[in-house]
Amino acid sequence: MAATQKPAAPKKKSQGFQGVRHAIIIIIFAFAVGICFYLFFLGNPANFANGDPEGHPLNMLGTVYKGGWVVPIILGLLCTVIAMSVERIIAISACSGKGNVTKFTENIKKALKDGDIAKAEDLCNKQGGSVANVVLADLKSYREMESAPIKLKEKVAAIQNAHEEETALEMPTMTMNLPIIATIVTLGTLTALFGTVLGMIRSFAALAAGGGADSMALSTGISEALVNTASGIATSWVSVVAYNYFTNKIDKLTFAMDEIGYTIAHTYEDKHPEA
């Protein structure tokens, strides 16, 4: 007799944009944009006296170009943060679903209060996204527990477990690529410090040359140090704002999930008192 095969566990249904899973592609592209911006925009001959990038800068763009080879690295980090932020905005919007999450939460709680599980499921199907997926898993467990031959406490625990499992499946979609933004918060500052040190080394080398200071070399070194400091701090600033914004959005979504999950479990407990 042939052995019966167990059906495969259902995969999480993909709904909307799930995020870029190969972030290295974004990083490479961002650094390519940063390098091109440095070479062809900041390094445009029109930004320098006599059209010579080695000469004196005529404007701020030329001054930033004089920051040296650390500048395109910082620009690459900045472009990475911007690209990752756009990716997270799209992904987290998809996780939120089609409608307002707060209104969706209120409608689900009202449907549960009325004992209308079918309406709650219909609301989830219309909403879509991670929050709706978690609520659907809770409601499915709710229905299954109605005919399960186990004690009430075990049924409530099963509904809570279903909620935790589905939440664990959805969280990676929401938090994906956030560690990269968090890393750039530190990398931006450290790269700026590195560029600053290189600029100061160049300045002191100019001071030490022949016992006197070459004013051109000295100003170049100081300019390099300050440009790297400013651009690195700006990159870290953008990264901090982006990271905190997205973590706050995710916290609100997980709070909505937990609020509805708690309501479903306790609604079941209230409507199915143990004999």
Regions found by a protein language model. Give the residues of each.
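Generic serine detector
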Residues: 14, 23, 85, 93-96, ...
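Residue-level signature of catalytic and energy-coupling elements of molecular machines
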Residues: 68, 82, 120, 135, ...
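Amphipathic, well-ordered alpha-helical segments in soluble domains
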Residues: 78, 85, 134, 196-199
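Predominantly long cytosolic amphipathic alpha-helical stalk/bundle segments
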Residues: 84, 90-91, 96-191, 205, ...
